[in-house]
Amino acid sequence: MVDYSVWDHIEVSDDEDETHPNIDTASLFRWRHQARVERMEQFQKEKEELDRGCRECKRKVAECQRKLKELEVAEGGKAELERLQAEAQQLRKEERSWEQKLEEMRKKEKSMPWNVDTLSKDGFSKSMVNTKPEKTEEDSEEVREQKHKTFVEKYEKQIKHFGMLRRWDDSQKYLSDNVHLVCEETANYLVIWCIDLEVEEKCALMEQVAHQTIVMQFILELAKSLKVDPRACFRQFFTKIKTADRQYMEGFNDELEAFKERVRGRAKLRIEKAMKEYEEEERKKRLGPGGLDPVEVYESLPEELQKCFDVKDVQMLQDAISKMDPTDAKYHMQRCIDSGLWVPNSKASEAKEGEEAGPGDPLLEAVPKTGDEKDVSV
């Protein structure tokens, strides 16, 4: 049975519509049509604004995801990573809101009555080109790392050559001859290389490689927006950038400067992290038999005891200890033993626990420990 309900709400008029004798029928139809067209145009305008807002939100989400990935590759700071993750979460929330509004707009459009302007539409008004389907599942972290390692081992020399280019024509020609370089692995390698150069204080070279890094990232972003393989669209990037489009060029330069600042920040964090690790290793090497750092123990000693270590005078140290409060003297000397600043003799090691020294009896009779790096033991 045919369902005729679809024709229940059709906003059309014909010559048999009854009108008042004093009203010009043609003018009435013309006014109705004009009002209907204006409503349709307003609706279309609102729909386009929603669509534009949704696309812009998706672009921001993609940009935030790119920065997050770049930060993870560069082993950036935790605070910056948390900030970007929070921003990405907020953007995804906004994206869902835009999509919901668009869906409501589509439902509203379907429920609108048909009219003479919408009863028929073009059947074919454009050509369709097959594109590579988007990946539904991302590779695991281990797979990505192995893929990156294999790619770098095979093409590291070519990637570095591309990183040293500067002219647009040279870069385009080199990528045309080596299209396998147009990929995410190349961009990741260039990012890490930039940070390494900044750590080595090769600032001018870092800025050169940073330029090529942004070139590759712009190509990848263009491919993502067009939903095609980057190797199929890198020439479009060079065509666009070489036409001296002011707005596009300003966007490129702004992103380049922002990227260089991020590289400097990552390099600074890496240096600070390396220094902390080095200091911790050196501290562990210095630890005495009781697990204390001799440098820290030395700095915590009273000034009169520090002077004894400075001049490496055992008798002077014993005299200073004998003049101190027995409890304080025992505390400081035990810390010196635990840190390795002092090595007690056999007599001292056999002393009963808790025994206090008298005014003329030093707490410990010690011998100097040789080979201390800080030269604070005697």
Swiss-Prot record:
Entry PTM: Constitutively sumoylated by UBE2I.
Keywords for the protein's UniProt record, in alphabetical order = Acetylation, Chaperone, Cytoplasm, Phosphoprotein, Ubl conjugation
The region called Disordered is annotated at 123-145, 347-378
The chain residues annotated with the modification N-acetylmethionine are 1
Residues with the Phosphothreonine modification: 118
Q: Which residues carry this modification: Phosphoserine?
A: 13, 120, 377
Output the superkingdom of the source species: Eukaryota
Where in this protein does the record say N-acetylvaline is found? 2
Q: How is this protein annotated for GO cellular component?
A: cytoplasm; cytosol; extracellular exosome; HSP90-CDC37 chaperone complex; protein folding chaperone complex
What Pfam family does this protein match (any one)?
CDC37_C
Q: How does it assemble?
A: Probably forms a complex composed of chaperones HSP90 and HSP70, co-chaperones STIP1/HOP, CDC37, PPP5C, PTGES3/p23, TSC1 and client protein TSC2. Probably forms a complex composed of chaperones HSP90 and HSP70, co-chaperones CDC37, PPP5C, TSC1 and client protein TSC2, CDK4, AKT, RAF1 and NR3C1; this complex does not contain co-chaperones STIP1/HOP and PTGES3/p23. Forms a complex with Hsp90/HSP90AB1 and CDK6. Interacts with HSP90AA1. Interacts with AR, CDK4, CDK6 and EIF2AK1. Interacts with RB1. Interacts with KSR1. Interacts with FLCN, FNIP1 and FNIP2.
Family per record: Belongs to the CDC37 family.
What is the protein name given in its UniProt record?
Hsp90 co-chaperone Cdc37
Q: Which organism is it from?
A: Homo sapiens
